[in-house]
């Protein structure tokens, strides 16, 4: 097995035993990126020289007996995380040449534990999209079938795992942007509880919905990474001050005796036949493992997409007001005064989908429509949260599909924004409720594309969904399937 095919925990063991060096591992991934990324387009920036310097320094620390959980492990970040001295674009022309002056907290924590940065990953511009087609740097392609999308907005983060260009990546999840691409690319994607991981240094899309999480090859690595990045951060006012458990220790507990809820609103007519079959097979596996199932109802699910696209766009309208060509960001040339400068800079700097969402959000917040749209959406959001609270009174976790279909073809939905938005119908409610969710590989479609299973837990119930995901992973081995590049 090549070094680039392995997991964090396997590489850790070899590094600590001095069987391999971090420089060798890092070179293996850099060579893999060089040989495969022209056809995948997962990376916006590759930090080759710095990565090799950091890997050499990691080898020195290992030789001195100073080995942290991620020492010498090469990782990559969605290009929405600020990285000091490294270009951070959020896949937008607006930030094409922006060099961050400080690190995001999540990356600071990974770096403090010895991680080596391979580079920054492609995404939908400002995390607005479900297909990774809305990037100023071109679309990312799914390594399983390059005519298909990898999912979004963390499409590069998922594609890099599937193409074996990185052992682990970080993404962000605002309406499914970790879980949906993980499902489409056959990897593990964890969206933690809102407030579990600091958002400091993450370019904001919708501040009440955004959450940082890991994308990995298996559940053990996801648990390990979450343990590194989770925890209170005084720099993030939404960060929650509660203890961080040892997530890897809970993995072996299994699901025997757990009650799993099946939300009837998620198993609907129109669900792709391959997805339906994968869910039925997953339920059968869990029954064999000793879990019990009950049907539950989340009655306001049908309102989730509309609610999300009012709240998220309203917050985006506010967050993206700072990009006006004066303080930072793209600055238009040959303009007639300040107002024209701002208008031209934003017109040139933002892509079509970002402009669409800014306009939707500005409209929802405008005088005369604020109560009718934004306030009403916040009230429905509360009802969706209450639906989940009620469901968790009788179950330990929920099992659902991640997406209604496997990955669709590039360009298939770009002309129909509503159809694109509806592809996140099973992931959006989780962000509105602020709970945790994980996508794990659960099958392969008839046309050879991965299908993911979604497990949802109570707020700060990551241990439960991780142990359930691990039990399923060990019983099925879907996570060992690899894209043929």
From Swiss-Prot:
GO molecular function term, any single one: ATP binding
The UniProt record lists the keyword Isomerase: no
InterPro entries: Amidase (IPR000120), Amidase_CS (IPR020556), Amidase_dom (IPR023631), AS_sf (IPR036928), GatA (IPR004412)
Broad EC category: ligase
The EC number(s) this enzyme carries: 6.3.5.7
GO BP annotations, alphabetical order: translation
Domain of life: Bacteria
UniProt entry keywords in alphabetical sequence: ATP-binding, Ligase, Nucleotide-binding, Protein biosynthesis
Reactions catalysed according to its record: L-glutamyl-tRNA(Gln) + L-glutamine + ATP + H2O = L-glutaminyl-tRNA(Gln) + L-glutamate + ADP + phosphate + H(+)
GO CC annotations on file: glutamyl-tRNA(Gln) amidotransferase complex
Active-site annotation: 78, 153, 177
One Pfam family here: Amidase
Protein function: Allows the formation of correctly charged Gln-tRNA(Gln) through the transamidation of misacylated Glu-tRNA(Gln) in organisms which lack glutaminyl-tRNA synthetase. The reaction takes place in the presence of glutamine and ATP through an activated gamma-phospho-Glu-tRNA(Gln).
The family this protein is said to belong to: Belongs to the amidase family. GatA subfamily.
Classification via PANTHER family: GLUTAMYL-TRNA(GLN) AMIDOTRANSFERASE SUBUNIT A (PTHR11895:SF151), TRANSAMIDASE (PTHR11895)
Subunit relationships: Heterotrimer of A, B and C subunits.
Name the record gives this protein: Glutamyl-tRNA(Gln) amidotransferase subunit A
């Amino acid at each position: 097995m090549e070094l680039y095919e392995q997991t964090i925990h396997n590489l850790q063991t070899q590094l600590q035993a001095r069987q391999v060096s971090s420089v060798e591992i890092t070179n293996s991934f850099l060579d893999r990126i060089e040989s495969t990324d022209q056809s995948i387009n997962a990376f916006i920036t590759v930090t080759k020289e710095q990565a090799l310097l950091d890997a050499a320094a990691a080898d020195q620390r290992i030789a001195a007996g100073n080995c942290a959980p991620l020492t010498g492990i090469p990782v990559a970040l969605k290009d929405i995380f600020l990285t000091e001295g490294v270009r951070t674009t959020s896949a937008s022309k607006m930030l094409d040449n922006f060099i961050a002056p400080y690190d995001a907290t999540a990356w600071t924590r990974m770096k403090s534990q010895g991680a080596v940065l391979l580079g920054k990953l492609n995404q939908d511009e400002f995390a607005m999209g479900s297909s990774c087609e809305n990037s100023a740097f071109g679309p990312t392609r799914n390594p399983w079938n390059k005519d298909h999308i990898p999912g979004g907005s963390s499409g590069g983060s998922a594609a890099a795992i599937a193409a074996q260009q990185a052992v682990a990546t970080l993404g962000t999840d605002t309406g499914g942007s970790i879980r949906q691409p993980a499902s489409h690319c056959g990897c593990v994607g964890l969206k933690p509880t809102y407030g579990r991981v600091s958002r400091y240094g993450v370019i904001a899309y919708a501040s009440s919905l955004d959450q940082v999480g890991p994308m990995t090859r298996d559940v053990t690595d996801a648990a390990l990474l979450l343990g590194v990045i989770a925890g209170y951060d005084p720099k993030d006012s939404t960060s929650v001050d509660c203890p961080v458990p040892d997530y890897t220790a809970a993995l072996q507990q299994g699901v025997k005796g757990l009650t799993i809820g099946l939300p009837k609103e998620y198993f609907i007519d129109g669900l792709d036949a391959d997805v339906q079959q994968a869910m039925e097979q997953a339920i059968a596996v869990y029954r064999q493992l000793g879990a019990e199932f009950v049907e539950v109802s989340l009655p306001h699910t049908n309102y989730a997409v509309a609610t999300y696209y009012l709240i998220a766009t309203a917050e985006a309208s506010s967050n993206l007001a700072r990009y006006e060509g004066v303080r930072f960001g793209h600055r238009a040339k040959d303009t007639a005064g300040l107002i024209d400068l701002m208008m031209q800079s934003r017109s040139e700097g933002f892509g079509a989908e970002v402009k669409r969402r800014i306009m939707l959000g500005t409209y929802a917040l405008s005088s005369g429509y604020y109560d009718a749209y934004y306030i009403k959406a916040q009230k429905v959001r509360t009802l969706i949260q209450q639906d989940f609270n009620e469901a968790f009174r009788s179950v330990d976790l929920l099992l659902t599909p991640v997406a209604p279909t496997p990955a669709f073809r590039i360009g298939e939905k770009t002309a129909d924004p509503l159809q694109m938005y509806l592809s996140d119908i099973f992931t959006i409610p989780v962000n509105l409720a602020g709970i945790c969710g994980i996508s794990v590989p659960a099958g392969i479609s008839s046309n050879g594309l991965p299908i993911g299973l979604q497990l949802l837990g109570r707020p700060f119930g990551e241990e439960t969904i991780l142990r359930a995901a691990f039990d399923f992973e060990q019983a099925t081995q879907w996570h060992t399937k690899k894209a043929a590049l």
